[in-house]
From Swiss-Prot:
It comes from the Eukaryota. Belongs to the ORC4 family. One of its GO terms (biological process) is DNA replication initiation. This is Origin recognition complex subunit 4.
């Protein structure tokens, strides 16, 4: 009887929503396992690390792929698999270096010493060279022969930045140790540069194993939809099975929706980075509440629109009517003179023509006020001065360029609160 009750457990909607938020947020924020569609790369990396950690062989490899392709996630998943193996007699030491933080070999060596907890061993000892210092550190970890020595994994994030260090001393010595029969060492570099091998000096390149693991986000759109569905579906272990069933059905219908498919297609075309998809899903999940218990196609459309807003068009919604008039005048000038730069005096003259045509003084501002408005548009970076021109030129005659196009101005006019009709008509006449 108790089993039947637990099976048919029906929780309040609020509690179900709270659990949905907890499960999906954890799933979208915390990346576990390995990235989608990289089974062969994962297997290759596990075998490589296994030979170092378990069999005492030294190795080196590069993981290459664009940002967001899952390089760090792949390495993390492989290390979790390695450290979970029964053959692991002792924990291997891991040293993490980042090219953005360790900007010189000296800083990198200090960081290696710190992470290996060998500050006391080094003490005030003076070394003749970088190689001698690094060899001493690794010698201090030895407990006997090669197989009984503690293996060390060096992870070099932003690997290409280490190639810019003077003489590439760190890379040379790490690869040299990995090639020799000293302490078992694995050197794994992570980089987004496909031409990274061209950055290495000949002596460094000769000591590198030339093992390269490529991650290129090569999954198809149908696989992209599969990732979307898997990430948003609730597990079978969800306490309220009826709610979970309805939720998963709604997610399935979302994937089949033409509207959602179009949104995801645009996202896929813009970037195959799974993290950007996660952010899109997360914003949609945040809209779920007691009164709105399921994600809808409209939610995704709105979230996509918010994430892809035009920042410059948004700035236009907050400018004054005078500043908006000046932008329309600039656009009119660019249309007349085929995109040639303009100066304040030209814009002011065009604005005066508009005032004279309307035969009223609602927009008849003093020139000093108009100059201030023009300067404010420059501060907002909606216009910029032309490069290579003398700064001694009077500001009224300094050539400028408009950083907006027709579509951005039209969109701003449509959304501008209480935009005067005559200003709209003037804008449309110049934009038509």
């Amino acid at each position: 009887m108790s089993k039947r009750k637990s099976k048919d457990l029906c929780l309040p909607v609020g509690e179900c929503i709270s659990k949905v938020h907890g499960i999906l947020r954890q799933r979208l924020f915390q990346h576990h396992g390995k990235p989608f569609g990289v089974d062969s790369q994962h297997k290759h990396l596990v075998e490589l690390l296994k030979r170092t950690v378990i069999h005492g062989e030294s190795n080196s490899a590069l993981i290459i792929g664009p940002r967001g392709s899952g390089k760090s996630m792949l390495l993390k998943g492989a290390l979790e698999d390695i450290f979970g193996m029964k053959q692991m007699k002792e924990t291997a030491l891991q040293v993490n270096l980042n090219g953005l933080l360790q900007t010189t070999d000296k800083i990198a060596l200090k960081e290696i010493t710190r992470q290996l907890h060998l500050e006391n061993v080094v003490g005030d000892r003076v070394f003749g060279s970088f190689a001698e210092n690094l060899s001493f550190l690794l010698e201090a970890l030895k407990t006997g022969d090669r197989k009984s020595s503690c293996p060390v994994l060096f992870v070099l994030d932003e690997f290409d930045l280490f190639a810019h260090h003077k003489n590439q001393t760190l890379l040379y010595n790490l690869f040299d140790i990995a090639q020799s029969a000293q302490t078992p060492v694995a050197v794994i570099g992570l980089t987004c540069r496909l031409d990274v091998m061209e950055l290495l000096e000949k002596r460094v390149k000769s000591r590198f194993s030339h093992r390269q693991i490529h991650l290129l986000n090569s999954f198809s759109f149908s696989q992209y939809l599969q990732i979307f569905q898997e990430k948003l579906s609730l597990p079978a272990s969800f306490p309220d099975s009826q709610f979970a069933e309805k939720w998963n059905e709604s997610i399935k219908s979302l994937v089949e929706s033409k509207l959602v498919e179009d949104v995801l297609q645009k996202q896929y075309n813009a970037s195959k980075d799974v993290r950007s998809l996660h952010m899109l899903m997360l914003l949609a999940v945040c809209r779920v509440n007691v009164s709105h218990p399921h994600i809808t196609a409209a939610d995704f459309l709105e979230v996509f629109r918010l994430r892809n807003q035009d920042s410059k068009a948004n700035i236009l919604h907050g400018v004054s009517v005078l500043e908006l008039c000046l932008i329309i005048a600039m656009k009119h000038l660019q249309d007349i003179y085929d995109g040639e730069p303009f100066n304040f005096q030209m814009v002011h003259n065009e604005f005066q023509k508009f005032i004279q045509r309307k035969a009223h003084s609602v927009y008849n501002f003093e020139k000093a006020v108009v100059i201030k408005a023009f300067e404010h548009l420059h501060q907002l970076e909606l216009i910029k001065p032309m490069e290579g021109l003398s700064v001694r030129t009077q500001k009224e005659y300094r050539l400028m360029k408009l950083l907006l196009d027709n579509t951005q101005i039209v969109e701003a006019l449509q959304k501008y609160p209480n935009c005067p009709t005559d200003v709209k008509q003037w804008a449309m006449s110049s934009l038509s």
